[in-house]
A protein has these predicted regions:
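Glycine-/small-residue-enriched transmembrane alpha-helix faces in small-molecule transporters
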Residues: 1-41, 87, 132, 146-173, ...
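C-terminal-most transmembrane helix of multi-pass membrane proteins
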Residues: 2-4, 44, 143, 242, ...
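Loop-to-transmembrane-helix transition segments
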Residues: 10-18, 62-87, 152-160, 195, ...
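Juxtamembrane C-cap of transmembrane helices in multi-pass membrane transport proteins
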Residues: 20-35, 39, 46, 86-95, ...
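Transmembrane alpha-helices of multi-pass small-molecule transport proteins
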Residues: 34-83, 110-111, 163-167, 183-200, ...
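Hydrophobic transmembrane alpha-helices of multi-pass small-molecule transport proteins
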Residues: 51, 123-143, 162-164, 188-194, ...
Length: 293
């Protein structure tokens, strides 16, 4: 059935499933009681090992070749995955969930800018307009975070968006490469790095069960997200991260009652509207251009 879908439908379905699976991730992170680097270690190690074992079980003989064939693009992507992992957890450790996820909602705009720089995809005027609007909204949120001494977490969230946008661009640039092995290496590299800062390698049963769920929310989700750019553009994949921006704080509010501030809501709504409007316009324009050809 999947093979009968068009490339646009395949990419859209993969991106949607991937981001929907990851939406409870911030809630799980907020619910565990371990130290930040301990969380980062287990959040990377367990999904990384699970995906590694699963990949070799499912693909058997070709698995090792897939890892060997990731090339320079795969190595760069693995480093970007490492950066995104570290900055995401650091963002949630230093600011509210809503603030962190709002920063990450900038992924489509950042991906569009990177596509212009590295893929020679000339952006529309609307891209620059939306980028400027998002910049103003980010400054608005940053200013409040500075007053509340939470600006460091917002900064980590912005860095995470940059890493994810760059990763999507790398994957878009080399659609012939299977980036799932690259993602697995990125997770394992994060575990190795964070192991140097772990305070204790023993955690409670409750925390272990919650972190084990990240095999699905972090591991499986990004397998779908890693494959999606083979079928649709980076900005199109990035638009689905708005689901995480919208649903992530909702789960946290419903279960542990963490409410975003009024200024965060105002800035966040502005960013979501700008990013959604930009991505919708770009998708429609791409479809019109294809029909014209």
């Amino acid at each position: 059935m999947f093979e009968k879908l068009s490339n646009k439908q395949k990419g859209t379905l993969l991106a949607f499933i991937g981001v929907m699976i990851i939406t409870p991730d911030a809630l799980i992170i907020r619910s565990v009681s371990v130290e930040t680097w301990d969380l980062l270690f287990y959040r990377s190690l367990l999904p990384g090992l699970a995906l590694l074992v699963g990949y070799f079980v499912f693909f058997n003989h070709r698995a090792l070749d897939d890892f060997k064939n990731i090339g320079l693009s795969g190595i760069i992507n693995a480093l970007l995955v490492l950066g995104a992992n570290v900055t995401f957890v650091m963002a949630l450790a230093n600011t509210d969930v809503a603030n962190a996820l709002i920063m990450i909602s900038l992924v489509p705009i950042i991906a569009a800018i990177f596509s212009f720089i590295f893929l020679n995809e000339k952006p529309e005027i609307i891209t620059w307009f939306c980028s400027f609007g998002c910049l103003l909204a980010v400054i608005f949120i940053f200013y409040e975070s500075y007053e509340l001494n939470k600006y460091l977490g917002d900064f980590y969230g912005l860095l995470c968006a940059i890493f994810v946008g760059a990763s999507l661009t790398v994957m878009r640039r080399s659609p012939e490469i299977n980036f799932v092995p690259s993602y697995i290496l990125g997770k394992l590299a994060t575990a190795v790095l964070s192991a140097f800062f772990v305070s204790a390698f023993v955690i409670g049963t409750h925390d272990l069960l919650l972190i084990s769920l990240m095999i699905i929310t972090v591991g499986v989700s990004f397998v779908f997200i890693s494959i999606a750019p083979q079928y649709i553009s980076s900005p199109e994949v990035g638009i689905f991260f708005l689901l995480e921006t919208s649903l992530g704080p909702l789960w946290v509010w419903l279960f542990i009652f963490e409410e975003p501030t009024q200024k965060t809501l105002i800035g966040g709504i502005l960013i979501i509207l700008l990013v959604f409007g930009h991505s919708y316009y770009m998708i429609k324009k791409e479809n019109i251009d294809k029909v014209a050809l």
